[in-house]
């Protein structure tokens, strides 16, 4: 045999073969995996190890590898994913251990996520303990364990992008305003078109697309004359309404939509999932007026 009876040499040959196989599958999609989180009090960490199938993701050895990597990363206070990958593990590094496991399972694997938060106190949440979605959150002072977990659950459920409005970039706000303006203009034009069609005794739903026009003519619901008339109305009214939209009204509606967006994406502005009558900010203030969230992170394997 290649190893000539040498156990260590045999293990090295198996490892190299596994690494070669792993390299060949590097182009495949790794969309399943294991996400775990851990807190040491003033610091919390998320690690995500990806694979290709749920079968491997649920495997005890795969979960243990993820846990071991998380424990190492926490113990060494790693700042970046690259630092985690380079940590000593077994006979090599963390990255080597991932490659070895990939060779054993026959699936592409990648250490894909590494996130940290720091504060006076921190909390973690593993959604339904299914290792697919984890959150970590840091506070400016010690906080009741149940309340801290509630905030971590809020982050998991409602997927905020910032703590408050100050954390939302001007670029995102500007983009949302632009989208809101265009949406509002389109709605105003649509209302005018529908009103004009109804006035001409044409059902707007019958002529809202070329496909519907064709199929509804085939069913005998509308005539070719109706379609021609509808197209003329749609073109004329759309152009006229678009040219005379009240700018101030459009801006006011768009600003209202931006405010709604910020309420939905800012953690402190969101309705609390445990008490729908209060915002997260109000819940925290009621517990301690000086309590602040200083940072949070969220990692999920699934597209949302």
What positions do the PLM features span?
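N-terminal assembly/interaction segments in proteins that build large macromolecular machines
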Residues: 1-304
């Amino acid at each position: 045999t290649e190893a000539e009876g040498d156990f260590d040499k045999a293990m090295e040959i198996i490892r190299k073969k596994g690494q070669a196989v792993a390299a060949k599958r590097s182009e495949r999609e790794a969309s399943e995996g294991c996400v775990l989180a851990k807190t040491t009090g003033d610091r919390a960490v998320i690690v995500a190890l990806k694979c290709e199938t749920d079968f491997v993701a649920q495997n005890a050895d795969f979960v243990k590898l993820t846990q071991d990597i998380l424990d190492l990363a926490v113990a060494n206070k790693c700042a970046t994913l690259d630092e985690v990958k380079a940590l000593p593990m077994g006979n090599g590094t963390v990255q080597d251990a991932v490659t070895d496991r990939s060779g054993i399972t026959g699936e592409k694997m990648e250490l894909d996520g590494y996130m940290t938060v720091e504060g006076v106190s921190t909390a973690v949440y593993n959604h339904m303990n299914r290792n697919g979605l984890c959150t970590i959150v840091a506070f400016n002072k010690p906080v009741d364990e149940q309340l801290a977990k509630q905030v971590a659950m809020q982050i998991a459920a409602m997927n905020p992008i910032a703590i408050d409005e100050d954390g939302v970039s001007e670029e995102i706000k500007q983009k949302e305003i632009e989208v809101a303006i265009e949406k509002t203009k389109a709605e105003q034009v649509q209302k005018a078109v529908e009103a004009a069609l109804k006035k001409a005794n044409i059902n707007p739903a019958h002529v809202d697309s070329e496909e519907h026009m064709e199929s509804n003519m085939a069913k005998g619901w509308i005539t070719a004359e109706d379609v021609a008339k509808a197209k003329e109305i749609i073109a004329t009214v759309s152009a006229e309404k678009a040219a005379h939209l009240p700018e101030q009204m459009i801006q006011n509606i768009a600003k209202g939509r931006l405010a709604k967006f910020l309420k939905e994406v800012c953690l402190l502005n969101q309705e609390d999932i445990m008490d729908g009558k209060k915002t997260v900010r109000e819940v925290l203030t009621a517990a301690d007026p000086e309590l602040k969230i200083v940072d949070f992170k969220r990692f999920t394997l699934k597209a949302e």
